[in-house]
Amino acid sequence: MDAAKYHIILIDAIGTGESSKPSDGLKASFPRYNYDDMVTAQYRLLTEGLQIDHIRAIIGFSMGGMNTWLWGIKYPNYMDAIVPMAASPCAMNGRNYITRKFISDSIRKDPAWQGGNYTEQPKSAQFATIYYNFATNLGTAQLVQKAPSYVEADEMVAKAFAAPYTVDANDILYQWEASTDFNPVGYQNIKADILVINSADDERNPIELGVCAKALNEIGHGTEFLIPAGPNTNGHATTFNANLWKDAFAEFIKNVPHGNQ
């Protein structure tokens, strides 16, 4: 997306970054939220706060990709295009949910969590985050290449634990539990042009399930750009490397009509 041509708006979703979150003061008294709440808040920010009545495209990765699917469903006339990356339009299920549950349960069952009203950060948050990152990220082939034996693997794990960890446990807990009821029902009614960008080695969105292909067939329009696994891919994190998909996106957005209403 050409920043000289378009205004690019980057939003910290509820519970993340500089947006409102438990660590701002309320701790466990902070209201629960889900992905639907995130999208509603983003829409109100754009329409009420910035007074923008139509946008060119909604683009998001992972959680942002799931938010992007919801955008297309909840506000079908608001954008010309949606570009969900590393995200499947289906209910949270299987390994994707189970591994997230490990994060929340490890924090909630940690005595140091104290019902969310701790004075020192429970160590379970760091442990669960590192586990989840290795389990559902980085790419299977890449991990084997970087850790061909237990020696290198031990070094990688030790390095991960030695790195500074400043994320608040309640913030992490709320963020992951926000995805629990994700279920983009009604995607068949999406009107915006669609470019789905996924990678063949995405651990959280296995291509063998065919979820995106099925959804696009039911929607009746849209394209999936699948990045083949290779030396420059990193599993779920593959789309961090824009060089792998920027040409496909540029060609797509060039052909999307303006002002889809």
Give the role of each language-model region.
Residues 65-76, 82:
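Short glycine-enriched nucleophile-adjacent loop
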Residues 78-162:
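Alpha/beta-hydrolase-fold enzymes
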Residues 1-37:
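Active-site machinery of serine-nucleophile hydrolases
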Residues 203-211:
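Conserved alpha/beta-hydrolase "acid-adjacent" motif
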Residues 214, 219-261:
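Catalytic active-site module of serine/aspartate enzymes centered on a nucleophile-bearing elbow/loop
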Residues 190, 196-198:
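Short beta-strand/loop motif that positions the catalytic acidic residue
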Residues 170-186:
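Active-site nucleophile elbow and catalytic-triad environment of alpha/beta-hydrolase enzymes
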Residues 36-57:
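Conserved acidic catalytic loop of the alpha/beta-hydrolase fold
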